[in-house]
Amino acid sequence: MLSCRRLPILAVCLASVLSCVTLWAYKDFVPPHPENASTYPSKDVHSNEKVTAAIDLYNAAPKDQIFSTPYSQYGILPVLLIITNDGDQPISVNNMRAELVTTGKSKLEGLETDDVFRRVARINGSSTEPTHVGPIPLSGNKNKKAQKQYDEITAARFNAEAVEPHTTRSGFLFFDVQGVKQPTAGAHIYLTGVRDAGGNELIYFDIPVIPSNAAQP
């Protein structure tokens, strides 16, 4: 049998191990390095404007391991959006809208940071002494984990306001696919609201989700 003296030591060791596991599980998010959008299978090239938009799904291993939060388990589809501007003038994407349209005609708009966070943090609105992560109240015992989740979502989301000449910008779109049948097979992602330097809106981007690039969530 273990002596009473050894029990406190074992407890301390176990606590240290659990602490290390927790720190590892919620490591700082490191975004993937984007290539030129023209190199991805799922893309739409606007030759006249010299702008290409592409997507890459991050809903299955090994790619989804860059996240600490298993978004697919919460019914959320993470999609890396890559936009390359090979022209000589900047383009504006601050009012860009993204929509996922499935073969079943479901139309899903990209989620805001708070929408993603509420799902993965499983917000409990009954807390009597809430603290806040971003604009959202949380009970104290959830706050540290939730802060890591919120920081990851904020760091991951596509947040560029413009794509400068001869530059590539990237970031994640998040879609709520909970309960949606075949959300990726045969689906398309549409981008609207992209404007040139003169304020003129470009023709919408229609990016097919290619089957080889689309692991089902």
Locations of the language-model features?
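Conserved functional micro-motifs across diverse proteins
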Residues: 22-217
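Bacterial N-terminal signal peptides
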Residues: 10-20
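Bacterial N-terminal signal peptides that target proteins for export
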Residues: 1-12
